[in-house]
């Protein structure tokens, strides 16, 4: 391999990109430039999302007013770039506008202190106050007729409310993708409000969209956490692996260019710079479509779409076919006598190339596994290149990957077998027991939320072909475990969880999988109130009923952490029978009052 050519290409792209950035920042008015690039509709939507993500407690009407004022100001600057304040940075303009909110101190407490800081510290301060768990009640949709009337009465306001409600609940949602989902939402109502049975049309379509939106939010939160906690290098490595799997015909220089651009886009969105993020994402889509011949044969269909659909299509595009003439990996990375020289001259480029070559050959591997293999390869070279005979030292490095590959394969196999046996709800309960014993200090709502999401991996991945299972499962687990890490970081209670979350991004899942029962945990005192139920349980939707039962299961385990699976099975079986009996009774509340204490006493006796 011609490393001089390779490295020259790498730096050529880096410098060309940097020059592009300098040109970008030379505009007289940044806000006018973004307004012109994005157009009024997308600009206003992004401003509404930005304010909703920063000021999560403010009413919708306040945000509409703020977004309107900023959009009008941008429009004026677009007409006359030398107008008053048009030359201010976007952070300054947005921060100044946030600090005009009269209720800032009352609603957000010490967040108001951010306004005493100067940029960029003020923006960093606002970012630090974003709340991943704002505690808003679940959204309850009105009747279909009322929804359709609201949609038809004022479509712009209706879609604005959608953006607001999602953004305030998900303060790191990928903003340009949220605009895309709002467009999908609009399409659902445009279709279903004409249907004879509006409810039958809306129900499944809204639920399918809701699932996509929740997954999109979790994925972007994972990306933002990767950037915030582990830096650009970790995010770029993740992106190289993912894009190399998806675009195996593209060369490493092309993948590197796209990864560099993609990293910038996500850094901007994670940093609250939504206008820049959306604009740069559109530019990246344009670049990919202009260069599709050197990236992938699968892009053409995406490139004929309008900008929002185009970017989304490119993000979800199917994997290209593998080139048929790929040489053995060993030739460049084991057998070449210059391995140590090439590694030491440009470590990140050499390791990036290894990751690229390995990933494009293994579309069946999870990104996390590919990164662990690259890390192992790096550690081997660090060790071997310091010896007298490096080639002998690293000769078997590719064979030594086997245990790292076997571990997630066996984990997925075992858990999919358990899922097939228990079904989703039973599988969730098994994970609840597992994770409560690993980290009993974590709050019960968090353990229930995370275990329910982990349990969905079975439904999502176990039905897939063997070649897709591991990639689906482990990458989904990485996203869900990130939710645990984000919530735990806010109120840390377990050193073991902190360790797994903070030591290594790629080893997070193996770290959690490897945790044993926490023997240092002091059991909670028994509280009968926790196990007291009322007739309202009977009318809850099935999912909420499951959460109530799972909450009781976690609390039982926190009281009796050494309870065996058989004991827990008995107690939860009794609990299910108790709920069924009382919900069928004529006097439901009377049944719960009378039978509840008996159940509690029986459970305590069974768990001795």
Curated annotation (Swiss-Prot):
A GO biological-process term: cellular response to calcium ion starvation
Residues binding Ca(2+) 1, per UniProt: 30, 268, 273, 276
N6-succinyllysine found at: 229, 460, 588
Designated name of the protein: Albumin
Keywords: Allergen, Calcium, Cleavage on pair of basic residues, Copper, Disulfide bond, Lipid-binding, Metal-binding, Methylation, Phosphoprotein, Repeat, Secreted, Signal, Zinc
SMART domains: ALBUMIN
Modified residues (Phosphoserine): 29, 82, 89, 443, 513
Albumin domain location: 19-210, 211-403, 404-601
Subcellular location per the Swiss-Prot or TrEMBL entry: Secreted
Mod. after translation: Phosphorylated by FAM20C in the extracellular medium.
Gene3D superfamilies xrefs: 1.10.246.10
Organism: Canis lupus familiaris (Dog)
């Amino acid at each position: 391999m011609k490393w001089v050519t390779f490295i020259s290409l790498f730096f050529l792209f880096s410098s060309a990109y940097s020059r592009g950035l300098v040109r970008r920042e030379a505009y007289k008015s940044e806000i006018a430039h973004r307004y012109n690039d994005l157009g009024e509709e997308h600009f206003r939507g992004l401003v509404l999302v930005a304010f909703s993500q920063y000021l999560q407690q403010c009413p919708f009407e306040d945000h509409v007013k703020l977004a309107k004022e900023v959009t009008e100001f941008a429009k004026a600057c677009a007409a006359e770039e030398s107008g008053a304040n048009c030359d201010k940075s976007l952070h300054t303009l947005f921060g100044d506008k946030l600090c005009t909110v009269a209720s800032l101190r009352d609603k957000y407490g010490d967040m108001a202190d951010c306004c005493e800081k100067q940029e960029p510290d003020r923006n960093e301060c606002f970012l630090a106050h974003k709340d991943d768990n704002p505690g808003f009640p679940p959204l309850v949709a009105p009747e279909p007729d009322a929804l359709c009337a609201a949609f038809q009465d004022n479509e712009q306001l209706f879609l604005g409310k959608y953006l607001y409600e999602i953004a305030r609940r998900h303060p790191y949602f990928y903003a340009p993708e949220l605009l895309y989902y709002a467009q999908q939402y609009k399409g659902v109502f445009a279709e279903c409000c004409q249907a004879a049975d509006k409810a039958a049309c809306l129900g499944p379509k809204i639920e399918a969209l809701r699932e996509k939106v929740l997954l999109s939010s979790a994925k972007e939160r994972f990306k933002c956490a990767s950037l915030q906690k582990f830096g650009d290098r970790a995010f770029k490595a993740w992106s190289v692996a993912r894009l190399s799997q998806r675009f195996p015909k593209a060369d490493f220089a092309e993948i590197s260019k796209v990864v560099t651009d993609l990293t910038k886009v996500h850094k901007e969105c994670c940093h609250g710079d939504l206008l820049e993020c959306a604009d740069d994402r559109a530019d990246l889509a344009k670049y990919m479509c202009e260069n599709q011949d050197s990236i992938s044969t699968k892009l053409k269909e995406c490139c004929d779409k309008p900008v929002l659909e185009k970017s989304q299509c490119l993000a979800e595009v199917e994997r290209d076919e593998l080139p048929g003439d790929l040489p053995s990996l060993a030739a460049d990375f084991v057998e070449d006598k210059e391995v140590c020289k090439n590694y030491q001259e440009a470590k990140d480029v050499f390791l990036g190339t290894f990751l690229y070559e390995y990933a494009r050959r293994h579309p069946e591997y999870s990104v996390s596994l590919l990164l662990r293999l690259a890390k192992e390869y790096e550690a081997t070279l660090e060790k071997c290149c310091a010896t007298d005979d490096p080639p002998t030292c690293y000769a078997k490095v590719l064979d030594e990957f086997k245990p790292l590959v076997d571990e997630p394969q066996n984990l997925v196999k075992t858990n999919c077998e358990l899922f097939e046996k228990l079904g989703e709800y039973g599988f969730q309960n098994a994970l609840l027991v597992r994770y409560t014993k690993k980290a009993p200090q974590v709050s019960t709502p968090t353990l229930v939320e995370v275990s329910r999401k982990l349990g969905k991996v079975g439904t999502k991945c176990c039905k897939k072909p063997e070649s897709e299972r591991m990639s689906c499962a482990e990458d989904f687990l990485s996203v869900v475990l990130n939710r645990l890490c984000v919530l735990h970081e806010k109120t840390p209670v377990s050193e073991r969880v902190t360790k797994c979350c903070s030591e290594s991004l790629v080893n997070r899942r193996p770290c959690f999988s490897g945790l044993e029962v926490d023997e240092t945990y002091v059991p909670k005192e028994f509280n009968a109130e926790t196990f007291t139920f009322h007739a309202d349980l009977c009318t809850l939707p099935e999912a909420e009923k499951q959460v109530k039962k799972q909450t009781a299961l976690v609390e039982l385990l926190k009281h009796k952490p050494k309870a065996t699976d058989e004991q827990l099975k008995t107690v939860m079986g009794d609990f299910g029978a108790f709920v069924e009996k009382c919900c069928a009774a004529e006097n439901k509340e009377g049944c719960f009052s009378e039978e509840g204490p008996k159940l509690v006493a029986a459970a305590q006796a069974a768990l001795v």
